Amino acid sequence: MGVMKEFKEFAVKGNVVDMAVGIVIGAAFGKIVTAFVDGVLMPPIGLMLGGVNFNELALILQEATGEAEAVMINYGIFVQTLVDFIIIAFAIFLVVRGINSLKRKEEAPKTPPGPSKEELLLGEIRDLLKQRS
């Protein structure tokens, strides 16, 4: 029974739950970005480049012969995935940058308070004693 209790404590901790929520939201965000890149961003870019469909861009290493399929390097899909990655990485960068700036504001050191009345009086007494000796 001890193992189950430990697992329950581990699974219910804030960090694990936060991480799980982050993973689910991240996966959904990735799908949104992929749909945006595939359906909205790449078609106009392909049109500007002379009607190129990035999904069909490939380097044929060996033509199809008989029953054997062609051997190709599909670099167009790679280009689209690279654009996906850049957009997601930039969005994550902006989020992390915002969080870091909030942390810096919270951690900003407060100016230390000036000396108390007792410290000032002790300093004056010290100075007077130095003058007498």
Curated annotation (Swiss-Prot):
Compartment list: Cell inner membrane
Top-level taxon: Bacteria
UniProt keyword annotations, A-Z: Cell inner membrane, Cell membrane, Ion channel, Ion transport, Membrane, Transmembrane, Transmembrane helix, Transport
GO molecular function terms noted in the UniProt entry: mechanosensitive monoatomic ion channel activity
Membrane-spanning residues: 10-30, 76-96
Annotated Gene Ontology cellular component terms: plasma membrane
Membrane topology according to the record: Multi-pass membrane protein
Alphabetical list of PROSITE patterns matching this protein: MSCL
SUPFAM superfamilies: Gated mechanosensitive channel (SSF81330)
Main location: membrane
Cell membrane listed as a keyword: yes
UniProt keyword Transport present: yes
Subunit structure: Homopentamer.
PANTHER family associated with the record: LARGE-CONDUCTANCE MECHANOSENSITIVE CHANNEL (PTHR30266:SF2), MECHANOSENSITIVE CHANNEL MSCL (PTHR30266)
Family: Belongs to the MscL family.
NCBIfam families with a match to the protein in the record: mscL, PRK00567.1-4
Role, per record: Channel that opens in response to stretch forces in the membrane lipid bilayer. May participate in the regulation of osmotic pressure changes within the cell.
Protein name: Large-conductance mechanosensitive channel
Species: Chlorobium phaeobacteroides (strain BS1)
The encoding gene: mscL
